A protein has these predicted regions:
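Glycine-centered signal
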Residues: 1-2, 14
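Sec-dependent signal peptide recognition
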Residues: 3-10
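Hydrophobic h-region of N-terminal signal peptides that target proteins for export
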Residues: 12-20
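A general sequence property marking short-to-moderate contiguous segments
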Residues: 23-49
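Gly/Pro-biased beta-strand-loop elements
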Residues: 39-169
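Conserved small/polar residues in nucleotide/adenosyl-binding loops
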Residues: 150, 184-186
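Cyclophilin-type peptidyl-prolyl cis-trans isomerase
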Residues: 167-183
């Protein structure tokens, strides 16, 4: 089985329900996909399960970069699956590379809980402006961070935590986008 490139998040809380429910009527992974994702991520999910057992986690998130999918996992079972868009620059952890880091992460900071849907954030601050949702499958010049920000912290020293590669210091997020329809067609 081909090893997938992945970013695994250990969430101490469930993501914002409105984000998680955004595509629930569009995508439902089949049993074969479920088994493959779980088997491919056993090492990470075992670590996550140990934290879950201690009561630290409600769910885990597995992001499969090669498939451009986010999976919500609990007790090694996929609950939901969503399309995502990772960095157009590829995978990597080097500071200022604009690449998507791999490995285990946790959601350290949640921003935007009270923000209106489609609110634009700049440098994690609410601008009180609303993004226009693009209804075509295009890549706009704007790269708005919208609705919510889940700021990630790396958990693997030397891979996504530490000087020059630290995901939190690189401002790595899961966030909303105004190009929502493009996610469905990736």
């Amino acid at each position: 089985m081909e090893k997938i490139k992945k970013l695994v998040l250990l969430s101490t809380f469930l993501l914002f329900p409105e984000i998680l429910n955004a595509f629930q009527d569009i995508i439902n992974p089949d049993v074969t996909t479920n088994r493959w994702i779980i088997e491919s991520n056993t090492k990470y999910l075992n670590k996550a399960s140990a934290r879950s057992f201690k009561g630290e986690l409600e769910a885990e998130i597995v992001v499969d970069i090669s498939e451009q999918r986010l999976y919500l996992v609990k007790n090694k079972k996929i609950l939901k699956s969503y399309p995502i868009s990772s960095s157009k620059y590829g995978e990597g952890s080097i500071q200022n590379s604009f690449k998507t880091p791999l490995g285990m992460h946790e959601i350290k900071t949640k921003i935007g809980h009270d923000a209106k849907e489609n609110t634009i954030f700049v440098a994690r601050a609410n601008t009180n402006k609303s993004a226009k949702i693009i209804k075509d499958v295009i890549d706009t010049e704007d790269d708005h961070v919208t609705s919510r920000i889940l700021w990630l912290d790396g958990l693997e020293l030397g891979r996504n935590k530490g000087e020059g590669i630290d995901s939190y210091n690189r401002y790595i997020y899961i966030h909303g986008t105004h190009e929502e329809l493009s996610l469905i067609h990736i």
